[in-house]
Structures are given as C-alpha cells and as structure tokens.
C-alpha cells in the first residue's frame, strides 16, 4: 500500500488558503514509472487469464477486485505523468476509452444500441485526440506516456533568448486599438481562468460598431479542454463567424495591424519555428509575431505549461501588458467606450 500512498501524496498539492485540494499542474514523473505501468498491465492480463481458467464465484470476484485495484493505480500513474499542456488530449483520449469500454459491454450483453453508441464515442474521442496531437506535432503514445519534445526536436541545447521586453499600460494599448483597422485576438487558458470573456466580447462589439475588423484565432489545444475557448466566447455572445481555427487564420497575421494575445503562451511560442532544439520544435502555433504590433496580456513573464521561454516577449514589435486579464480588459473596455 506504500506505493499508492506515495503517488497520492505527490499528486495533490494541498493549499490551506484555498480550503481545497488542488491538482499540481506539473507532471508526476515517478522513477521507473514505465516499468511500474508495464507490471500493472501484466497483472491485469494475469487476473483476466485466471478469471477465465477458474469459473468459481470466489475466484471471479477476487480477480475482478484485483483488476479494478490495478487499473485504478495505473490510471493515476499514467495520467499524473502528463503535463498540464497535454490535458486536452488526455480528456479526449479518456473519452475514447470510455466509448470502447461501452462498445465491449454492448458486445457482451448483445445490446446493439450500446455497441453503436460506444463506437461513436470511441471513434469521436480518437479523432479529436489525433487532430490535437497533429497540431502539436506529437504522437499519441508520446503524450500518453508522459514524454517531452515533438517529433522534430533536434535534441541539442535550446537557443538562449537575449534582450529586454517592452511594457505598455492600458492607455498605450487603447491608443493602438483606436489606430488599428484589422485586429486579431488570440485567447488562451488565462482568459478562461480570469473569466475575461465578457468584457472582451463587449469590447469586440464596440470595435465592430466603430468599423474595425476584429476576429479571434483559436489553437486546437488552447484552454483546459477541447473547445473550451469556443464555448466561453459563445457564452459571452461572440458571433461564430469571427471565431476562426488556427489553419483558417494563420495566413492573415501578416496583414494584421494589431494582435492581442490574452492569456496564451505555448500556443503562440515562436520557438516552435525558430529553434530546432526546443522541446516544442515543429509544433503548429499561431504566428502572431507576424502582425505589425503584438500586445501580450499576461499575469507575469512566467513560462507556460511547456516550461519554454517565449521569444515573442522580446521581439521589437511586441509589448507586454501585465496584470489580471479581466481587470485589464475591464479597463480597456471602459476607456474604449
């Protein structure tokens, strides 16, 4: 019982001030985790084999309990080794697992409806997982096994980022927004955490009335789960036709006057294209740095989930507007009105 106890203690980061247990976003890389997971899987197979060999009720229930316990431990050790940036893929993959389990149950019970529904859930989850892994230039086993780096990572020393960043205030940003004609907003998980979608939606509505072309660029793995940002923007009343996927909008950045990055980091990291030794090399990102002017709205200069410095922060056409996203967007909205 010592191993599961150690896993649970390491997995949860207790914060008394928040008065609840919060999951630690950093991956839990246990020593020998691959060997441990392999042993747990073999134990599951062994329990299943014994279940078929011994038809007695006692043996069957014992093996069922054993398989349940081993599967629970393996579920924790597998999922905990995956970083926060890969959680959207984990969610869709677990969704796919549940579908195939339902499909197998349908076969066992000779229930066609369960089989069909399970196949639909399993295939849709698998397709979503594939789409997001392709967007990150990674394979599904690479994500599920808690590995780092894309298939294009050269393996050398990452480039060092030199220079200083430029900071602007709300008044400077309002002036840039007023002077811009074409504006693209790229939200990330920080927008959802701060609940800034409502002032952003109202600001976009005002800018559209003033004749400005404002659109949103959404990365496939942006947010805490698939489609989270699309849902948040729709909830706030943003029209569907101005919310575009990465492939639809990436070629338009070079013709954009102003780019507003709100709470995004890894999904707009230019190191994916500029540094072949970066662990995110080859990952498909939103090319926001091609815009004439970039304003990055973040709480701080800290790195994202991938723990990779973002060269965009130090580019000559980029400036940082630091602070809480909702408070900043509220201030921008009040000055634009």
Walk through the language-model features, giving the residues of each.
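Membrane-interfacial segments at transmembrane helix termini in multi-pass membrane proteins
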Residues: 120-180
């Amino acid at each position: 019982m010592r191993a599961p106890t150690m896993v649970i203690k390491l997995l949860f980061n207790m914060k008394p001030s928040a008065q609840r247990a919060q999951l630690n976003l950093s991956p839990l890389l246990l020593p020998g985790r691959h060997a441990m997971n392999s042993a747990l899987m073999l134990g599951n197979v062994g329990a299943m084999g014994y279940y078929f060999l011994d038809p007695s009720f006692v043996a069957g229930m014992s093996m069922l309990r054993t398989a349940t316990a081993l599967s629970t431990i393996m579920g924790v050790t597998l999922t905990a080794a995956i970083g926060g940036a890969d959680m959207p893929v984990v969610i869709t993959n677990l969704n796919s697992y549940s579908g195939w389990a339902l499909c197998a149950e349908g076969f066992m019970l000779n229930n066609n409806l369960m089989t069909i529904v399970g196949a639909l859930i399993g295939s849709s989850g698998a397709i979503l997982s594939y789409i997001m892994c392709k967007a990150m230039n990674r394979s599904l086993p690479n994500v599920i096994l808690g590995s780092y780096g894309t298939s294009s990572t050269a393996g050398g020393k990452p480039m060092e980022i030199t220079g200083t960043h430029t900071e602007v205030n709300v008044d400077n940003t309002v002036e840039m927004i007023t002077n811009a004609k074409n504006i693209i907003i790229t939200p990330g998980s920080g927008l959802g955490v701060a609940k800034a979608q409502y002032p952003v939606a109202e600001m976009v509505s005002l800018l559209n009335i003033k004749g400005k072309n404002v659109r949103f660029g959404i990365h496939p793995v942006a947010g805490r789960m698939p489609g989270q940002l699309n849902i948040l923007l729709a909830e706030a009343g943003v029209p569907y036709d101005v919310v575009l996927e990465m492939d639809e909008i990436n070629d338009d950045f070079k013709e954009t006057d102003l780019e507003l990055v709100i709470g995004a980091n890894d999904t707009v990291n230019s190191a994916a294209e500029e540094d072949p030794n970066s662990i995110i090399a080859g990952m498909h990102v939103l090319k926001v740095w091609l815009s004439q002017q970039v304003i990055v709205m973040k709480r701080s200069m800290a790195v994202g989930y991938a723990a990779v410095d973002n060269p965009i922060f130090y580019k000559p056409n980029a400036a940082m507007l630091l602070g809480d996203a909702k408070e900043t967007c509220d201030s921008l909205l009040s000055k634009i009105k």
